[in-house]
Regions:
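Bacterial N-terminal signal peptides that target proteins for export
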Residues: 1-15
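Hydrophobic helical h-region of N-terminal Sec-dependent signal peptides
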Residues: 16-20
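C-terminal motif of bacterial Sec signal peptides marking the signal peptidase cleavage site
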Residues: 22-26
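Compact, glycine-rich, soluble single-domain proteins
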Residues: 28-31, 36-148, 152-167
Length: 167
């Protein structure tokens, strides 16, 4: 029986190695091109962001305007809006609003499977040092920058000061 022992051990080692290789291959990462971004085997998915409802309110002053939009995250991982750039303003800052108090912040959370809502009277973008006073109907380029996702470029319409989007 000792003569067969090393052969059996060798065969068992080969079977174990092949089995482990197959198991590890099955647990590999999903490819970066077009995966569904869902939760795979208990791992958080990547954020999947889209933007809707964006607009700039026509400013009553020449040097400052406000921007509003919604960022939808259909992915299983959270992200953060870290900055916004536009040729319309030399500076865009992110603001939260609690009660009557407005506070500048360095980022805004985009929750997994959730939305970030920037609305009039709520969290919003402040555009300062405008290059010109935008007029109703004009379209302004914005680039949204995130902590983990690629930047998103959008064209944003300028709406009347009294504009309120429909829900």
């Amino acid at each position: 029986m000792t003569a067969a022992g090393p052969g059996i051990r060798k065969a068992a080692a080969v079977v174990l190695t092949v089995g482990l290789s197959a198991a590890l291959a099955a647990c590999g990462s999903e490819d970066g091109g077009g995966g569904d971004g869902g939760d795979h085997a208990g791992h958080k998915g990547a954020p999947k962001l889209s933007v809707s409802g964006a607009y700039v309110s026509q400013p009553p002053m020449d040097d400052m305007a406000a921007g509003y939009l919604a960022v939808r995250n259909a992915g299983g991982g959270a992200d953060e809006l870290t900055s916004v750039t536009t040729p319309l303003a030399s500076e865009v800052t992110l603001h939260t609003t609690k009660g009557n108090r407005m506070k500048q912040v360095s980022s805004l959370d985009v929750p997994a499977d959730g939305r970030l809502e920037l609305t009039s009277g709520g969290d919003h973008l402040m555009l300062t040092n405008l290059t010109h006073r935008p007029k109703v109907g004009e379209r302004v380029s914005f680039t949204l920058h995130f902590a983990t996702s690629d930047p998103i470029e959008i064209k944003v319409p300028v709406e009347p000061t009294t504009y309120r989007p429909k829900d």
